[in-house]
Amino acid sequence: MSRIYEQIEKDVEKIIGQYDGDKNGEVTINEAIEFFKRMGSKYPEKCAIVLFKMYDLDNEGKISYDEIQEEIFKRYQDKVREDQIKQYFQDDIEAFLLRYDKNRDNRIDFKELEQCFESIGSDHPKENANHIFTEIDKNRDGYLTIAEIKNYCRNTIRSKPYYQS
């Protein structure tokens, strides 16, 4: 993990070096506009404004090495968290299929799901299975596929207030 952070630091130094016209370690809005002009941007002012909205964390009108590094680290950590969540659900889906896909066709039919609820002691296994099928079986073919389950989990996570992408 530390090699990744070292690479991010090197990349941030390159970024600052490209934008920082007077080489003082900070980038002003004018330096960013000049950089985008040199790069041939049709909209250098707009590009600079977007850059500053992303990285001028303290709204001082200049971007420092620390601000860029902090934002890149934050985005990297958010990506790692998202990848961990995806892996968690992938593992859960596979374990669910291994346990309840009795005929090993890589999908769950209504009866298999009903038996799943029975095995965990549900008082209303048929109603629970029906509810799940209504929510997840989007093509109404009578089977829950890995893709449908993943899609449902992904949409459910994104609708929660604690998840930010």
Swiss-Prot record:
Residues engaged in binding Ca(2+) 2: 56, 58, 60, 62, 67
Membrane spanning stretches: none
Keywords: Calcium, Metal-binding, Repeat
Binding, Ca(2+) 4: 137, 139, 141, 143, 148
Residues involved in Ca(2+) 3 binding: 101, 103, 105, 107, 112
One Gene Ontology term of the molecular function aspect: calcium ion binding
Family matches, as InterPro entries: EF-hand-dom_pair (IPR011992), EF_Hand_1_Ca_BS (IPR018247), EF_hand_dom (IPR002048)
Gene3D superfamilies: EF-hand
Annotated Ca(2+) 1 binding sites: 20, 22, 24, 26, 31
Domain EF-hand: 7-42, 43-78, 88-123, 124-159
Superkingdom to which the source organism belongs: Eukaryota
Protein name: Calcium-binding protein H
Annotated source species: Dictyostelium discoideum (Social amoeba)
